[in-house]
Amino acid sequence: MKNITKYQGVIPAFYACYDAEGNISAEGVKALTRHLIAKGVKGVYVGGSSGECIYQHVDERKAVLEAVMSEAKGKLTVIAHVGCNNTADSVELARHAESVGVDAIASIPPIYFHLPEYAIAKYWNDMSAAAPNTEFVIYNIPQLAGTGLTMSLLREMLKNPNVVAVKNSSMPTQDIQMFKDAGIAARGEGNFVVFNGPDEQFVSGRVIGADGGIGGTYAVMPELYLAMNEHINKGEIEAARAIQYDADRIIYKMCEAHGNLYAVQKEILCRMYGLELGGVREPMPGLIPEDEPIVAEAQAMIEAAIAKL
C-alpha cells in the first residue's frame, strides 16, 4: 500500500529562478524553497510549466532540483517533473531525480507530434523504469501538451505499480471524477491520488474528489489556497468559495499584464518578501513599464485577501 497522505494538500508549482544574466539562480531557488516551507505548504512541484521546463537545458533542470532538495528534503513532498521533448533526456532526468531522493517524478505526454497511445505509455514507462524506486505522476494538460489523457491510456498506465497519481490540468472537473474512479478500481480506495490543476477551480476540483492541488499561482498567495483547503476539509464550502473568488479575481488581474503571468508573480514576491527570482526566459514576454499599475494592484489585492482570512 502506498503512502498517499504526503500528496494530500496544497503543492505549489515551483517558479524558475534566474539571476540578472538570466542564468539559474541556486540562491533564488533555495530562498523560494525556504519561503514555501515557512508558509506551511505540503510540498513543491519542481520543473513543470511554472518552472519553464521546456526553456531549460537538462543540466539546468538538474541544478534546480538539487537546490530545492538541499532545503526541502525531509520537510516537503517533492515531485520532480522530468518530461522533455525526447525520451533519452527524460530518462536522464528521471534517474537523477531518484538519485537526489524525490518523492515522485512526473511527466507530460510527448509534445508536438500526436503519437499513438502505446508510444505515450512507453515514453512514460521508460522514465518510470529509470527511477524504479520512485512513484510516478501522470501530468494531464491537453490544452498545452496537445494530447489528453484518455481512460484507455490511464488504464494501461495503471498496470505500472509506481503510477500513483494524475495531476489533472484539463478544465472539466468531470475528468477528476473519472480518473479517480479508474484509480480506485485498479488500486482500491485510498491508494490513488488526483490533483486539481486549474487554480481557478481549486474548490470545485477538491469537492468533486481531488486529494489536493498543484498550481502555478499557489506560491504567490499560498495563504489563500491553504485556507480554501482547510475550509473544504471542514465542510465549510461557502467560506472556501469566497476565498476562491478572491483568488480568481487576483489571477484575472495578473493576466492583464503584457508580461507573462510568472513574471508578474515573481515581481510580486520580490516586492512582498524581497525574494530575488528574476524574470522569465524568452520567448516568454517579460514585464514592461506599463505593467506597473497591474502588478501594484494585484499585490494590493493579494494583501487584502490575506488580511480577510
Report each predicted region and the residues it spans.
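A general structural signal for well-ordered alpha-helical segments in protein cores
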Residues: 29, 61, 65, 90, ...
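Catalytic cores of TIM-barrel enzymes
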Residues: 2-6, 186-192, 269
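Alpha-helical structural signal in soluble globular domains
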Residues: 39, 63, 67-72, 96, ...
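Active-site beta->alpha loop and helix N-cap motifs at the rims of alpha/beta catalytic domains
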Residues: 2-148
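Catalytic alpha/beta core domains of metabolic enzymes, predominantly
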Residues: 130, 142-248, 258
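Secondary-structure boundary/capping positions in well-ordered alpha/beta enzyme cores
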Residues: 75-76, 134-135, 161-164, 276
